[in-house]
Amino acid sequence: MVATMSRGSPVTKLSLADRFALWVSKSRVTDGLWIGSAQSDSEPALQRVEAALQLINRCAPLHYRRVKNSLSRIWVTLVPHGAGCYLHSLNACLLDERVVASENTTLEWIASAIVHEATHARLEKRGIRYDEAVRHRIERICARRELDFARHLSGVDALHEEITRRLDLCNDENASYTDQNMWQKIDQGNAEMLRHLGTPEWVIALVFRARDLLNGIRRFTRRIAGASVQ
C-alpha cells in the first residue's frame, strides 16, 4: 500500500520544486498540522483528511500525538508508487489523490495510512534510514503500528485483513523491497500518472527515453571525471 521516498540525512531547506508545489496547492492548518491538495477542486480531499485526523484523535489519542509530533504536512497529490508515501524533504505524508477520492476508500483506511507514514517519519528522526538492507524491517514496524491503530476501531475487518496480509509480506525474501524493483514500480507509477493526466503514449515514451539518455550522460561524465583524477 505505502512506501517511503525518504532519502539521505535530514535536511531543513526545501528544493525549489518543493516550494513551487506547496505554493500552488490549496491548504489550511488543522490543529497545527498543514494539510493541502494539488487538485483544482481540493475541498473534498481536505475534508476527508481532516475527518481521518479527527478519527485518529477520537479513537487513538496516542497515535494522534505521534502523527502531530512526527509530521509537518499531509499532502494529497499524485503519488507514483503505491497509494501513499513519506517524503523526507517536506517531512510530509503524501496520499494519492485518486485513492483519497475513490468511493472504495474509507476514512479508516486514510487514517491508517497517515499512521503508517507518520511512523516512517518517526523512525527517520531517530536516524533509521530507509536503506535496502533494512527496508522490510521498517515496513514491518510501520504495518504493526497500523495494526495497533486498527484495533481501536470497530467494523474494519477488511482493513485488518489488508494490514495483516502486508505484514506477512514484510520479510527479507520479498524481492519487492529491493532498490531495483522499487524503481521499476516508480517508473510504472509515473507512466500511470501521465496517462491519468491525459498525456499521449508517444509523449510518455519520449519522456522516459530523454530521462534514460540524461542518466547515461551523467554516468559517462562521472566515469570520465574519475579517470581524469586517476
Please place each PLM-identified region on the residue numbering.
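Acidic/His/Gly-enriched intrinsically disordered linker/tail segments
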Residues: V156-E192
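Pan-zinc metallopeptidase signature
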Residues: Y177-Q230
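Short pre-active-site segment immediately N-terminal to the catalytic Zn-binding motif
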Residues: E97-A113, A133
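Auxiliary, metal-adjacent structural segments of Zn-dependent hydrolase domains
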Residues: A21-A92, R151-G155
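Anionic, Ser/Thr-rich low-complexity intrinsically disordered regions
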Residues: G84, H88, L107-A111, R137
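Active-site recognition of the HExxH zinc-binding catalytic motif
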Residues: S112-K125
